[in-house]
Amino acid sequence: MRNDQEKALIFEMSKPGRVGYNLPALDVPEVEVASLLPKHLIRETPAELPEVSELQLVRHYTELSRRNHGVDNGFYPLGSCTMKYNPKINEDVARYAGFAQTHPYQPEETVQGALELLYNLQEELGEITGMDAVTLQPAAGAAGEWTGLMMIRAYHESRGEAHRTKVIVPNSAHGTNPASAAVAGLDTVTIASDERGLVDIQALRDAVGPDTAALMLTNPNTLGLFEEDIVEMAKIVHEAGGLLYYDGANANAILGIARPGDMGFDVVHLNLHKTFTGPHGGGGPGAGPVGVKKVLEPFLPTPIVAKKEDGSFYWDSNRPASIGRVKGYNGNFGILVRAYSYIRTMGPEGLLQVSQNAVLSANYMMRRLATAYHLPFDRVCKHEFVLSGVNQKKLGVRTLDIAKRLLDFGYHPPTIYFPLIVDECLMIEPTETETKETLDEFIDVMLQIARECEETPEIVQEAPHTTVVKRLDEATAARKPILRYQPQA
């Protein structure tokens, strides 16, 4: 049981004069702050920091850490997020002094090992995706999307076709797709999915035209279904003068099985913090490398790592058609090291097994859960699948209630209410790293909740029951966030 002291904010635990650490006596001449900083940077009053003991501080943050949920302490079936286990060997490699203690301004000759790793990673990601060249600069998936779209825009402008400003996006797409297009100065055209949950080919034919810049597509899509008409779709877009952009959010389903470049895509971004065990969460850092076909290679961000004839590596900045830098320095190096470690550890056969097992796990879960939840698209899925809580909704229980009830059993809920085209949506992605026993335990809980919806719906409607914080006013929290401590008047 948690007591009030453990639940208190650290500011509420503060007592004037309580000291957590004593600094040693000053052994250098004291200098007035005003002689070092301009007046506008100097506080007029001391910062109102909490005054607590070191033990209080340790216990407070240890308690908060226990309330966190992550892949290292529980199943995390968050759809379209690939919350897989992050092998700890990657952490060991990233902490090698030759990597961890490098500085981006070091002379090239002093960081040849780091440059070689980046060069090899560029080559390997290009091979995995079927692309001809890769940039490692983008800091995350959405940054990769924007980078790819800026290159597409530069490509059309270089051909005197600046009027190509329309980006076609399926209605099942990630929300970052239209957002990235808008930031890149492009307009979005949304097309419908058909009864299969796939892009409506006729809708695509009707949408393309002389103003088409690109089609943005996730394959498999956000419903976890493979876009089986992709070759025909690529032909339609290319014949209209547009390019194909591959959102790599769901690449965990196709490693070693299929490559975007072979499907007809011209540019692709990958989420290294998802597919290649970055890790991710907590706001970052992430990494969203972008691969391109030769038609877009001149527009890659500068610099990229290149190799000289003598075998040494250097930063190639002589790229006159480049869209320029997209990030300070040269990418989130630590995440790139972890991804490289993962690829080298797994090898081609290991990466193939990753996707095979991810797809197998998703289909196993889908079939068992379809006995209690509505399955809107009854066909083989890839790495993730979508259920609907419409049956439970008829009983007065919403998908949100089901998600809250899962918290009582120690599970992070799946993605809910996305994609938007499925009513009362539950999107579940088990990943390849979970055992069958773990999957069965989660399935059994989901089936129990389905029974509760029928027999004792109030238990689900009022969940969670065992968490420190119960139901929040989520709408007000989103619209009127309180982001700092505000003492009671």
Curated annotation (Swiss-Prot):
<dbReference type="Pfam" id="PF02347">
    <property type="entry name" value="GDC-P"/>
</dbReference>
<dbReference type="InterPro" id="IPR015422">
    <property type="entry name" value="PyrdxlP-dep_Trfase_small"/>
</dbReference>
<keyword id="KW-0560">Oxidoreductase</keyword>
<dbReference type="InterPro" id="IPR049316">
    <property type="entry name" value="GDC-P_C"/>
</dbReference>
<comment type="similarity">
    <text>Belongs to the GcvP family. C-terminal subunit subfamily.</text>
</comment>
<comment type="function">
    <text>The glycine cleavage system catalyzes the degradation of glycine. The P protein binds the alpha-amino group of glycine through its pyridoxal phosphate cofactor; CO(2) is released and the remaining methylamine moiety is then transferred to the lipoamide cofactor of the H protein.</text>
</comment>
<dbReference type="InterPro" id="IPR020581">
    <property type="entry name" value="GDC_P"/>
</dbReference>
<dbReference type="GO" id="GO:0030170">
    <property type="term" value="F:pyridoxal phosphate binding"/>
</dbReference>
<dbReference type="InterPro" id="IPR015424">
    <property type="entry name" value="PyrdxlP-dep_Trfase"/>
</dbReference>
<dbReference type="GO" id="GO:0019464">
    <property type="term" value="P:glycine decarboxylation via glycine cleavage system"/>
</dbReference>
<dbReference type="InterPro" id="IPR015421">
    <property type="entry name" value="PyrdxlP-dep_Trfase_major"/>
</dbReference>
<dbReference type="GO" id="GO:0005960">
    <property type="term" value="C:glycine cleavage complex"/>
</dbReference>
<dbReference type="InterPro" id="IPR049315">
    <property type="entry name" value="GDC-P_N"/>
</dbReference>
<dbReference type="InterPro" id="IPR023012">
    <property type="entry name" value="GcvPB"/>
</dbReference>
<protein>
    <recommendedName>
        <fullName>Probable glycine dehydrogenase (decarboxylating) subunit 2</fullName>
        <ecNumber>1.4.4.2</ecNumber>
    </recommendedName>
</protein>
<keyword id="KW-0663">Pyridoxal phosphate</keyword>
<dbReference type="Pfam" id="PF21478">
    <property type="entry name" value="GcvP2_C"/>
</dbReference>
<dbReference type="GO" id="GO:0004375">
    <property type="term" value="F:glycine dehydrogenase (decarboxylating) activity"/>
</dbReference>
<comment type="subunit">
    <text>The glycine cleavage system is composed of four proteins: P, T, L and H. In this organism, the P 'protein' is a heterodimer of two subunits.</text>
</comment>
<dbReference type="GO" id="GO:0016594">
    <property type="term" value="F:glycine binding"/>
</dbReference>
<dbReference type="GO" id="GO:0005829">
    <property type="term" value="C:cytosol"/>
</dbReference>
<feature type="modified residue" description="N6-(pyridoxal phosphate)lysine">
    <location>
        <position position="274"/>
    </location>
</feature>
